[in-house]
């Protein structure tokens, strides 16, 4: 819903947002618990906290006193869609880890939109840690205007945030999103590249994702080097 220029969700799933009711979610969790003994799970929702009221209602329903047992779970959202009260409620409802797509230490506003800023990223991580929730930060390397200097800013910012876990990925411009269109227009992607390269999580030399997009100052080998260095 924020039209992040690197995102492929708009083309894959459309723009319609649908919230499941707390009762619907709890029914599924109760079934998993009673049938399979499941007590840990992950909510695969890119922006779990998009609707704050709905999220708070869900946290109330997931509280161990109402659920009848303690469910440990992980989730992900944007840094500009959390606050202290919300994260504390999530912890009480069993949240173990919150993943944030922070993405970059220089171009965060350009690529994510909304109110996602470096300052807000610091607050989101801090609030989660204060609530005793682990954090995972996702970062991108290899945006069209990327240079060794901007990569270093991203690495330094990731170190400053001190997330529990950090993941660095080479930027993947999926066909159909704004980043891809801009890269093709700028000549940073050759249209005759084989489609098998456009696979999220695809790897190249050394287990690093094979670069599709290169920049004026960074070749594919440079992007692989910096991604390894970031880890």
Where do the protein language model's features map onto the residues?
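Radical SAM [4Fe-4S] cluster-binding motif and immediate context
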Residues: 1-138, 156
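A broad, structure-centric signal for solvent-exposed, well-ordered loop/edge residues
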Residues: 14, 50, 89, 118, ...
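Alpha-helix C-terminal capping/termination sites
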Residues: 18, 144-147
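C-terminal accessory regions of radical SAM enzymes
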Residues: 31, 134, 149-152, 156-167, ...
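Short, solvent-exposed turn/loop segments enriched in Gly/Ser/Thr/Pro and often Arg
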Residues: 46-51, 78-79, 140-145, 169-178
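Intrinsic-disorder/low-complexity, polar/charged segments
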Residues: 51, 105-107, 121, 147, ...
